[in-house]
């Protein structure tokens, strides 16, 4: 007999989420996740993927992944610390370090795993972490797992960060203090004030950690937010994903050799999870090589991002203060944002609504993610649909 308590808990809470318009229905994409997708037989302009550079469907990467399956199999077969470390993993990590301008790098199974692994391996109950109030959920969970004292500072507020860093240092309570931030904030598209953060870190001897999941492949000519500001020798820990702009799956942390040596023996997701698959490893390596060889895809991404932003702004939509191709249309009311997303879907645009608690209450939005793979015709069609629905709903 199964638990009646569990059944009651699930029924009550799922019903509550649905009543408040906060239950997320998951759509199934039929086929590849490209600039256009098909859901339940309906063709849609896709403005919701993280496939920034269109590499998830890149033909060269697909072919090299197939060859890796033939030569190395479909899986690594073990955790990295037993005999799951393949030559392909070492080659990938060397390429990541070269890409990020660091001594070494370590690859994980996902970006979320990176933050769970690296933060808790370096910080403990005798330490403190200064964390931006809008940091990603994986950072929040990684900080909690470390058992360090979590001190939130107001989003990108350098005065608040400096004051809280000063108080933490002067308290004498902590062995180590880390400051951690997203490089690019995924809900609003703004970029962290890394030069000022680094200055504060140097003033108070803080460990610097940048989660560049949405910056790698996008900012710094593709090399990320740390490179964008020329701070490769000033940031202790650079985290990034092999999904999003790279188009595959996995994540990494890059930094000094001593840091990577420590993570290999103390980060639990590395120690207790089977390694990244051979196909994913070689496809990720090739994607990074492509970014290092040419800025063409990166330039196309920014061109399309600027084009969509300008089109939506001219219509009168509130697109916030985004500094990257991420383009929110901030509606405000949560239910209205969800209705707007639904109407866009009906007219041929897939742009998911983002509501509380993912964003602050009263800032419900539809988040647009243009990619290098979109054509101008696709973006023009999307803008026209935005205009039609926006006027119908009296949003513009």
Swiss-Prot record:
Residue numbers carrying N6-(pyridoxal phosphate)lysine: 244
- Broad class of enzyme this protein falls into: transferase
Query: What are the required cofactors?
Result: pyridoxal 5'-phosphate
Locate the residues binding substrate.
136, 358
EC number(s) in its UniProt entry? Answer: 2.3.1.-
The reply on keyword Cell membrane is no
In its UniProt record, which GO terms are filed under biological process?
Answer: biosynthetic process
Q: Which PROSITE patterns match?
A: AA_TRANSFER_CLASS_2 (PS00599)
Can you tell me which residues bind pyridoxal 5'-phosphate?
Answer: 111-112, 186, 211-214, 241-244
Question: Can you provide one Gene Ontology molecular function annotated for this UniProt record?
Answer: pyridoxal phosphate binding
Which InterPro entries does the protein's record reference? Aminotrans_II_pyridoxalP_BS (IPR001917), Aminotransferase_I/II_large (IPR004839), AON_synthase_class-II (IPR050087), AONS_Archaea/Firmicutes (IPR010962), PyrdxlP-dep_Trfase (IPR015424), PyrdxlP-dep_Trfase_major (IPR015421), PyrdxlP-dep_Trfase_small (IPR015422)
The keyword Repeat is assigned to this record: no
Disulfide cysteine pairs (residue numbers) = none
Q: Which UniProt keywords apply?
A: Pyridoxal phosphate, Transferase
> Which Pfam families does the record associate with it?
Aminotran_1_2
The subunit structure is: Homodimer.
What family, per the record? Belongs to the class-II pyridoxal-phosphate-dependent aminotransferase family.
Which protein is depicted?
Answer: Putative pyridoxal phosphate-dependent acyltransferase
Protein source organism: Oceanobacillus iheyensis (strain DSM 14371 / CIP 107618 / JCM 11309 / KCTC 3954 / HTE831)
